[in-house]
Amino acid sequence: LERNTKLNSDTIPFPARHLLPMENYIMAQESHGYSNGRWTSMISSRGCPYGCTFCASRKTRWVSRSATDVADEIEYCIEKWDIREFHFEDDNMTINVKRLIEICDEIKRRKLDITWQTPNGIRASRIDEEMLRAMKESGCEHVTLAPESGSPRVLEDIIQKGKDFDLDHLRDCGATAHKLGLKVAAYFVLGLPGETRKDMEMTISYARQLAKVGVDEVNFGLFIPLPATPLWEPSKHKIKDMDWLDLLTVGDLAKAVSFTDEVG
């Protein structure tokens, strides 16, 4: 299909949930986020302009939906299936702070009785107290931050997180979110190529700092090399026959192969 660079994302139909056995999905409670009831996933934007070297969504065009369109889909899910919990799976929901606050305002304006969360993570460099407060007031219960590492060297030289990323600011964001009554999680990646034992110890130490300021949960994931990313080196990583199932974090590759000399 020819790529339409002038596509208005608001013209794209809502996901065809009506073609799925929605009650089965709702009752299974197999969500990416923390499900407490009748839930569904949602995407308010696609893409991420940042260049994290391990990420499948790096440097992709960011396209967003309007606050009105997002609220329309929420309202539709309420009316059709009585869904009251929404898990936003955007690659980077906080690129446009003004738009995110507009979504929060639209949810409040329509008096939509919902809860929502960001299990895919939001970028701390775009967060401030005004945004977190707007999220909380519109029903957000849980935010996930993605520091990836507690080592400045890893963030700058290996992950290439971006010059605007600051670990101290992320810690402050976690403290502010906790103060406002939000549940907070933080994601880290271990085992990156070139990562040392000292780097990993710094990450663990930083995770403890987050816990002290009120972050409720920290998650450590293993690095998995993905095709078309800068860290994809099949020969170096001893990948002979590529099977996409092996590239999932739940696959055998994650258990059998280490991508740094510091971890067995």
Residue ranges and their predicted role:
Residues 1-7, 91, 169-181, 208-220:
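Short, basic, helix/turn surface patches
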Residues 2, 12, 100, 130-131, ...:
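Short aromatic-enriched loop/helix-cap "lid" or pocket-rim segments at secondary-structure transitions
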Residues 1, 8-9, 51, 63, ...:
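Short catalytic/ligand-binding loop motif for oxyanion handling, primarily in non-cytosolic enzymes
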